[in-house]
Amino acid sequence: MEKSEATTIDVAETSRESKGKAPLLRDPPAWVPAAVERQRAAPAYKRGVAIFDLILRISAATAALAATITMGTTEQTLPFFTQFFQFQASYDDLPTFTFFVIAMSIVTGYLVLSVPFSIVCIARPVAAAPRLLLILCDTLAVTLNTSAAGASAAIVYLAHNGNSDANWLAICQQFNDFCQRTSGAVVASFVAVVLLIFLVVLSASALKKH
C-alpha cells in the first residue's frame, strides 16, 4: 500500500497584497486622545464663560438702572428765594444730563432684553449666532454709554470747579445735593461701561474658542 506524501509549499505574499491588509486593532495616534479631550473641554469652558457673562450682564443692568434713576430724579430747590426768582436746579435744565438719562435708559433696556440670549448661551454653549449678536450689540451699548458718561462727567466737573476763563461759577457750594446725585449717577454709568467692556471681551474669547 503506497503512502502519498503531501507537500506543503509556502507562497510569500506580494507587496501589493500586504498593502491591502490592515490589522483590525491598533493603537490610535498620540494626537487623537488630546483632540478628543479638547473637544470635551470646549463646551465646559464656554458654559463657564456664559454663566460669568450672565452675572456681569445683570450687574451692568443694575449699574445702568441706578445711574438712570439717580440722574432722572435729581432736583434741588434752595430754601431762599426773591420776589422774582426761585433758585432751583434740575437735571433737565442741562441738555447733556437729559441726553444722559435717555442714553442710559436705552442701555438699561438693552441689557435687560439681552439676558434671555445670555441664558441661551448657557444652554447651548457651542452656538455661535447668539454670542455674535451679543458682541455686536454690546459694542454699540458701550459706545452709547461711554458718550453719555463722558459728556456728563465734563458738566459735573464744571459744576464742581467752574471755569474762570469763561466766567462760569461753580454751583456745588449752593446746590450740594444736586452735585452729589449727579456725580453718583456718572460714577454708576462708568461702572456700567467697565462691565460692558468685560462683556465684549468675554464674548470675543468665547467666539475665539470655536
From Swiss-Prot:
It holds the Pfam family CASP_dom. Keywords: Cell membrane, Cell wall biogenesis/degradation, Membrane, Transmembrane, Transmembrane helix. Residues 1-48, 120-138, 205-210 are cytoplasmic. Residues 1-25 are annotated as: Disordered. The chain crosses the membrane at residues 49-69, 99-119, 139-159, 184-204. It is found in: Cell membrane. InterPro entries: CASP/CASPL (IPR006459), CASP_dom (IPR006702), CASPL (IPR044173). Residues 70-98, 160-183 are extracellular. It is a multi-pass membrane protein. The keyword Cell wall biogenesis/degradation applies. NCBIfam families: A_tha_TIGR01569. Regulates membrane-cell wall junctions and localized cell wall deposition. Required for establishment of the Casparian strip membrane domain (CSD) and the subsequent formation of Casparian strips, a cell wall modification of the root endodermis that determines an apoplastic barrier between the intraorganismal apoplasm and the extraorganismal apoplasm and prevents lateral diffusion. This is Casparian strip membrane protein 1.
